[in-house]
Amino acid sequence: MKNLISVHDVENIHHLLEQALMFKREPLAERSLGSGKKLGLLFMNPSLRTRVSTQIAASNLGMECYVLNVGADNWPLEFREGAIMDGSNVEHIRDAAPVMGGYFDLIGVRTFPSLRDRTLDYSEHVIHSLMKYGGRPVLSLETATVHPLQSLADLMTIREFLPEGRRPKIAMTWAPHVKPIAQCVANSFSEWICAWGQADFVVAQPEGFELNESFLCGARVTYDQKEALEGADFVYMKNWCSYRDYGRVHGSAHEWMMTLDHLKLTNQAKLLHSLPVRRNVEVSDEIMDHQDCLAKNQAAN
């Protein structure tokens, strides 16, 4: 595996999942695997769980890890080809990436979408520029369209709580939010669940908030949240802004906030959220504090 950008870079998702669970049980099992290697983590946006967990994972493998916060620890970067750099961006990725490639054996990058220019965001120009000019394997720590490490942690959590002897139903339900939120977590979760192929998967959202079909991989889609929740064994709660009317926030959809009344429709479902969460906007306090909420398990994975 040269790069890990999405589930499409994973040769065998079942093997990867078992390996990840093994490392959870025995975190120092391959302490010398990364000996002598250096991992550079390039953060263009805030991060808590991805940042810390990746640093810990690198340490457990014996790697040295270096964190760079773009615009804070190092110069603001320019990614446009042919740009006349007379603005606030000081260094071009064509110059910075080869330098980082000389320092590091592996480069991780985290970047958010603009949520203004769909074509540019979905081209994944940031991570592709790093892959093009860095000369090193690249690890996605979240990009404009996907979040593979989050999805792997999600799948690990589901695997740990699978009901015995039957195929589970997994519902991903849209949740309200006060500002535009990227589609990357929802896109990625859909891709990974469909690639895993061990569950009946349904996505529920209001009209106008359909995800890009290329990420749904044939998953069932409904505008009826109650229908999606009916009999679900797992419920993934997540906001995303409109793809069709790119970046738009739903004006009023409080009824989509997950509450105990919604939970009653499920098959005593385990509850998932990638965090951070806007309590009592996306999800009620009672849901986040519920014994079946696995958000902290996801973070640990």
Model-derived features: where do they sit?
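Positively charged, low-complexity intrinsically disordered leader regions
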Residues: 1-52, 56
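Peripheral docking tails and interdomain loops at the edges
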Residues: 4-6, 137-166, 171, 274-301
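P-loop/Walker A phosphate-binding loop and immediately adjacent motor/lid segment at beta-alpha junctions
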Residues: 57-59, 66, 126-142, 201-204, ...
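Glycine-rich phosphate/diphosphate-binding loop of Rossmann-like nucleotide-binding domains
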Residues: 44-66, 159-237
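Phosphate-coordination loops involved in phosphoryl transfer and adenosine-cofactor binding
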Residues: 33-39, 166-169, 268
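Phosphate/diphosphate ligand-binding glycine-rich loop within oxidoreductases
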Residues: 32-40, 47-159, 278-279
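Rossmann-like adenosine-cofactor binding region
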Residues: 215-293
